[in-house]
Amino acid sequence: MQDIGEAVIKIIAMPSDTNPAGNIFGGWILSQIDLAGSVAAKEFAPERVVTISMKEVVFKQPVFIGDLVVCHAKIIKVGTTSITVIVNVTAERYCKESHARICQHVTSAEVTYVAVDSLGNKIVIDPDLIRYRGF
């Protein structure tokens, strides 16, 4: 079971997600990172959150069609109006030669979200909620 402020998204990379070289498109992976991070932030605070930044993302390994892409998101910091999440991305694939599953770290990202009202204005995250949830 995950803690509040954590999220795991698993998805199979499909042919429609490829770039011209046949690997999975980096933009698709960035989208999955943002989805996982926003789920973690939303589980922590009920306010609407929007992405304001994503720090450097370096792709260390390619992702291939059929890989199981796992995005594990965990809140690392909560401010007055913002929530910062670290998202680690791995790709799991079956190796025919060794008959084993291989898990490779693809990338990590630090994503910051800001709580906003219905008009898109920054709002304060409930301080009692922050204290109650241990930040």
Residue ranges and their predicted role:
Residues 3, 7-9, 64-65, 76-135:
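HotDog/MaoC-like acyl-thioester-processing domains
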Residues 12, 16-17, 56, 63, ...:
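Generic hydrophobic-segment detector
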Residues 46-62:
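Small beta-barrel nucleic-acid-binding modules, principally OB-folds
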Residues 1-50, 114-135:
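Hot-dog-fold acyl-thioester-processing enzymes
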